[in-house]
From Swiss-Prot:
Catalytic reactions on record: ATP + H2O + lipid A-core oligosaccharideSide 1 = ADP + phosphate + lipid A-core oligosaccharideSide 2
PROSITE patterns linked to this entry: ABC_TM1F (PS50929), ABC_TRANSPORTER_1 (PS00211), ABC_TRANSPORTER_2 (PS50893), MSBA (PS51239)
Protein name, per record: ATP-dependent lipid A-core flippase
Organism of provenance: Alkalilimnicola ehrlichii (strain ATCC BAA-1101 / DSM 17681 / MLHE-1)
Assembly notes: Homodimer.
């Protein structure tokens, strides 16, 4: 368990989190100073309400001073206006800064997600990552807005009221301070509990968000396999756990405030009792006594908020820990400096071995493979043989633990990631499309927007132009989340068009035609054959009929290269490839 995850963080750790949270406020420090000034003035206006009571009682009702009858009401109106204006100014300014902080933190977290290695996403579910981006970041807003308002305005309100009460009767104020240790004990105990429960609540938000995402995204599978009851019960368990954590949090919050207020009420009761004693009546006027009691009553609500804000602060600090874990996570290693305009396409795997993080099983073992520029190499093998993993090492989604991969004679790590990946186009087995127009999906990632003719050429080559032109908006049609408005074959063809338009010298085709019907597949294969000329192409396919014309076929088994050759050579060899071929075309013997 990391240091930042201890249930009882030290004051130093909390202060470090405060500094990091308020570091996001630094760009807006001028507005922050303005807000603080307005909050202090609003606090002074609040204290002025207690002050005006003494001349109101003594001057207007007891002494019946004609002048007091004029200036006291006018001053009361002025105090109200002053307090209202300063309160509005502080609340609006703090809200603006707080929302800007949320925007900046959320942007920083999202950009960090884009920089993190693939292994990070293997270990963290999308629901958890989305919860950090939305729920946890919003909790930080409490420290940047509501907590600041309470800690500054309400704290200064208490200070000003205490100062005025001391001016009226220092002896009575000592009674109020006498019960201060009780309040401190309650607040300290509540702080530890708040932080612990806040972490648990935020973790449960990620859990039920993930379950909800699974149920919504996989709704077809849920329905066809009758999993509605199972998913509902799974969500109910997590939702109930979150509810319990929330109610425990609310119980601590509800108990801590009355206990702390009890001390203040006891002090008020003692003061009311002492107010009837002659020794007190000789030192303070009736208006002063009423003003003192009014000041104490006015002090209770801000005191309650100051005590209650600890819950928000601890919640924000717990959220801050979670968010800063993301921001502190090491990004993909990218230390290369070698320029790369356009690769020739010579790829070499030199004794490469790889296993996934936190796994002891080697997925790839001692891979030696050289792919010449412009050569089409197909990777085949049983499921789990390492085909897709081998291809994922080329764009450095992962780095091998042993051996070296070279492009044009230089190790991949010598190139900047952006330069390296700009040389590759990928059509993955799991097609990813964005909730945007077809044109933007096909042109995704290009530095310059392609012309309409270029878009049409790419779509035509991918056998997609015909169905695109039949859509009401054509290339401007928004296709929904992950292309939900398109069929599986259409989505695959859009992904191929995207790869065609990028025109990279290296192609990675992972099950690139697996979702196409026979006629479309034939036409796509023709287009891909034209595209692959002069380009280094790595094809991963389970269906051996799609790679019979490859320049070379590499057969993987248990993470090792066991055979290599052309389709005819491997059939004549009567080894692993021939066995796979017989299973696919003749059925198991």
């Amino acid at each position: 368990m990391s240091k930042g995850h201890s249930d009882h963080p030290s004051a130093g750790e909390s202060w470090h989190l405060y500094k990091r949270i308020f570091g996001f406020i630094k760009p807006y420090w001028r507005l922050g100073v303005l807000a603080i000034v307005c909050m202090v003035l609003a606090a002074a206006g609040q204290a002025a309400f207690a002050w005006i009571i003494q001349p109101l009682v003594d001057g207007t009702f007891i002494e019946q001073d004609p002048g007091a009858r004029l200036w006291v009401p006018a001053t009361l109106v002025g105090i109200f206006l002053f307090h209202g204006v300063t309160t509005f100014a502080s609340d609006y300014t703090v809200a603006w800064v707080g929302r800007r902080v949320v925007k900046d933190v959320r942007q920083a977290v999202f950009e960090q997600y884009l920089r993190l290695p693939t292994s990070y996403f293997d270990k963290n579910s999308p629901g958890t990552l989305l919860a950090k981006l939305t729920y946890n970041v919003n909790q930080i807003s409490a420290a940047a807005s509501k907590a600041v308002v309470v800690l500054v305005r309400d704290t200064f309100t208490v200070i000003f009221l205490l100062a005025y009460m001391t001016y009226l009767s220092g002896w009575l104020v000592m009674i109020v301070f006498g019960l201060g240790p009780l309040v401190a004990v309650v607040v300290t105990a509540a702080n530890k509990r708040f932080r612990k429960l806040s972490r648990r609540m935020q973790a449960s938000v990620g859990e039920y968000a993930q379950i909800a995402e699974d149920g919504i995204r996989g709704q077809a599978e849920v329905k066809i396999f009758g999993g509605q009851r199972y998913e509902a019960e799974r969500f109910d368990r997590t939702n109930t756990r979150h509810h319990r954590q929330l109610m425990r949090y609310k119980a601590v919050q509800a108990a801590s405030q009355p206990l702390a207020q009890l001390g203040a009420v006891i002090a008020l009761a003692i003061i009311l009792y002492l107010a009837t004693m002659d020794v007190i009546l000789e030192t303070i006027s009736p208006g002063g006594m009423i003003s003192f009691i009014a000041a104490m009553l006015l002090m209770l609500p801000p005191l309650k908020r100051v005590i209650g804000v600890n819950a928000e602060i601890q919640k924000a600090l717990a959220a801050g820990e979670s968010v800063f874990e993301v921001l502190d996570a090491p990004p993909e290693p990218d230390h290369g400096q070698r320029p790369l305009e356009r690769a020739r396409g010579l790829i070499e795997f030199d004794r490469v071995a790889f296993r996934y993080p936190e796994s002891e099983d080697w997925v790839l073992r001692d891979i030696n493979l050289s792919i010449q520029p412009g050569e089409t190499v197909a990777l085949v093998g049983r499921s789990g043989s390492g085909k897709t993993t081998l291809a994922s090492l080329l764009p450095r989604f992962y780095d091998p633990q042993r051996g070296e991969i070279r492009l044009d004679g230089h190790p991949l790590a010598e190139y900047r990631l952006q330069a390296l990946r700009s040389q590759m186009s990928l059509v993955n087995q799991q097609v990813v499309l964005f909730n945007d127009s077809l044109a933007n999906n096909i042109a995704y990632g290009l530095s310059e927007r392609p012309t309409a003719a270029q878009l049409q050429a790419a779509a035509r080559a991918a056998n997609a132009l015909e169905f695109i032109e039949e859509l009401p908006e054509g290339f401007d049609t928004v296709i929904g989340e992950n292309g939900v408005m398109l069929s599986g074959g259409q989505r695959q063809r859009i992904a191929i068009a995207r790869a065609l338009l990028k025109d990279a010298p290296i192609l990675i085709l992972d099950e690139a035609t697996s979702a196409l019907d026979s006629e479309s597949e034939k036409r796509i294969q023709e287009a891909l054959e034209k595209l692959m000329r002069g380009r280094t192409t790595l094809v991963i396919a389970h269906r051996l009929s799609t790679i019979e014309d490859a320049d070379r076929i590499v057969v993987l088994d248990a993470g090792r290269v066991v055979e290599t050759g052309t389709h005819r050579e491997l059939l004549d060899h009567n080894g692993h490839y021939a066995s796979l071929h017989r299973v696919q075309f003749n059925g198991p013997s």
